[in-house]
Structures are given as C-alpha cells and as structure tokens.
Amino acid sequence: MGCTMSQEERAALERSRMIEKNLKEDGMQAAKDIKLLLLGAGESGKSTIVKQMKIIHESGFTAEDYKQYKPVVYSNTVQSLVAILRAMSNLGVSFGSADREVDAKLVMDVVARMEDTEPFSEELLSSMKRLWGDAGVQDCFSRSNEYQLNDSAKYFLDDLERLGEAIYQPTEQDILRTRVKTTGIVEVHFTFKNLNFKLFDVGGQRSERKKWIHCFEDVTAIIFCVAMSEYDQVLHEDETTNRMHESLKLFDSICNNKWFTDTSIILFLNKKDLFEEKIKKSPLTICFPEYSGRQDYHEASAYIQAQFEAKNKSANKEIYCHMTCATDTTNIQFVFDAVTDVIIANNLRGCGLY
C-alpha cells in the first residue's frame, strides 16, 4: 500500500519530467545557435572570410554588390600603383625609363582630383600599363615589405587590360581581392549543418578595438586570423611595430582573457599562398631572430604556429589551427566544414549532450 503513488506525487513527477524535457530541448536549441567572433589585427583577412561565407552559405554577391564593388576595384588598382610610386621616391628607386615621369604625374593627378573610383580613361590605362611594365616600378614592388601596399596590388595591376575594358564587370574573385577598411561591426547570418550562425567581423586596426567589447557575451567560438605573410612588415598605425609581433600580442590577450575560459579558439594562419612565395626570399629571422630552421614553407609555418600555441596558458584549452587562403573559396569551404564539426562537438559537450 505504501508503494502506491499519490495523485499529487504522480503530478509532481510528471511536472519534473516535463521540466527536464524542456531543459533538454532548450539545451539542444542553445547548441544550435552559434555566435562566432572574427578577431585579428588589421588586414589579416577577416573581411574576406565574411565575403566567403556569403558565397558559400548564402546566395553569393547580389547585382547591387557587383555594382558597389566596381569603383572599389578601380580605386584599389590606382591607389596600389600610387603607393609604389610614392615608395620609389622614399626608397630612392629610379624609373627604368625617364619617360615614365610623365605617366607617374598623370596617375598622381587622377588621385589628386579624387577620380580614382571612376573607369580608367584610355590615357590613364596606357600610363598605368607602361608604369607597371617599368623595371624601376617592378624593383620597388619587390621591396613592398618596406612600405604599406595592398596585398592585391599585383592581382589587379597584372590584369589592367581586363579592368580597363568599357564593359568591365567585377568577378567574384575581384570582389574577394578588394580591400576596404572595416569600421564598426559587420554581422552575417547563415544556416549550415542545421546550425544558426551569427558571424561578427570587427575592425582590426588598433583604433577600432574598443568597439569589440559588447560582442563578447555568449560567444561560442573565436576565429582569430593572422596574416602569415606579414612577418617582415610593420603596422599602418605604428611603423615601428612588426605586424606578426602585434598579432601575437593580441592573440595572447584574447586567448588568456578570463571571459573566454570556455570559448573555443580557432586560429586561421591566413595568406598561406603569399607566405609560401615570400619565405623563399625574405628570412623568417626578420621577425623571429632565434629561428634556426630552413627557409621552407612547412618548417617556417610550423614554427609560426608553435609561437601562437605557446601563448595559451590554459592546460584545458585547445587551439584549433588551420592554414588558410581566404581568397580561395574551396579552401575556406573545407576549413569551415572542419571548424563546424569542432563547434558541434564542443557545444554539445558544453550542454551535457555529448
């Protein structure tokens, strides 16, 4: 008789089961909402990753996007050439042919009149082609680690003929290669593997960092981008600071921040294509004087990875590292797939469901 449950007890047990069921459902829903924060120093490739998410997980760029990026392509191309011309003067590099002085003045005048976002006139296009083919300009370009130059300078300047066509329309790759400084916070939403992603890109320059703070709450994972190819370059904002050293310092402050004790950290060692070319001719000892390995992509990139992993002071925190090329859609698709699997496993574990 004592084993029979009273009506109240049965109701209480049913209530308890319902609460447990609801909690589990809430946990599963929480595990489906993923908030990713893209961090990293300026020009590390964060905005390119955001563009890739639009290509891979949304319907790509809209007709309006293509229209809006056209003047950006023109401007990036002209401004890249101007950056080289200004550096020639500072580095004491002369033109291969004295006739290029006239062409250089024409290009400089276009920028002075703020016409660099407009389609190239025939005169401007001819001048730019002659300048880009000049031995002195190429010599100065080969020393681009000594001044500030857009990574995509060669990509655009090698293709002046196509960009100068009257019917020119940007391609997907052109848009991925454009450089516009991110100010404020860019947010992208998409669904992948039955998960709802919110991806936040915040300005990487030092002056922008104070704007990150309110994004930090409830972050599932941080994707930290590093431009591997910048080991021999200095910052825009402070020309005495090595870019790789700045990235390491920033990574240290993010990785060991008390807010991120339980946050997955994914490290994208980006611009691997540029790094692979550069490491053949520019020694890693510029950034890491103690490096005694070979000037070889695999050995040098493994050394850089180890420097970042060594900043992690927590025995319980794992850093998930990937070598990436943000302008390569196939590479980013593959890497993001792997990243998502890690997030799913960690998230389910955190909700007690794995």
Swiss-Prot record:
List residues with covalent lipid attachment of type S-palmitoyl cysteine.
C3
Q: Which Gene3D superfamilies match?
A: GI Alpha 1, domain 2-like, P-loop containing nucleotide triphosphate hydrolases
- Annotated positions binding Mg(2+): S47, T182
Keywords for the protein's UniProt record, in alphabetical order: Cell cycle, Cell division, Chemotaxis, GTP-binding, Lipoprotein, Magnesium, Metal-binding, Mitosis, Myristate, Nucleotide-binding, Palmitate, Sensory transduction, Transducer
| Complexes and interactors | G proteins are composed of 3 units; alpha, beta and gamma. The alpha chain contains the guanine nucleotide binding site. Interacts (in GDP-bound form) with gpr-1; gpr-1 forms a complex with gpr-2 and lin-5. Interacts (in GDP-bound form) with gpb-1. Interacts (in GDP-bound form) with gbas-1 (via GBA motif); the interaction leads to activation of goa-1.
Write out the function statement from the record: Guanine nucleotide-binding proteins (G proteins) are involved as modulators or transducers in various transmembrane signaling systems. In the 1-cell embryo, probably together with gpa-16, controls nuclear rotation and spindle elongation during mitosis. During the first embryonic cell divisions, plays a role in gpr-1/2 cortical localization and in the proper orientation of EMS blastomere mitotic spindle. Polarity determinants (par genes) may regulate lin-5/gpr-1/gpr-2/goa-1 locally to create the asymmetric forces that drive spindle movement.
By its UniProt entry, which PANTHER family does this protein fall under? G PROTEIN ALPHA O SUBUNIT, GTP-BINDING PROTEIN ALPHA SUBUNIT
Provide the protein name: Guanine nucleotide-binding protein G(o) subunit alpha
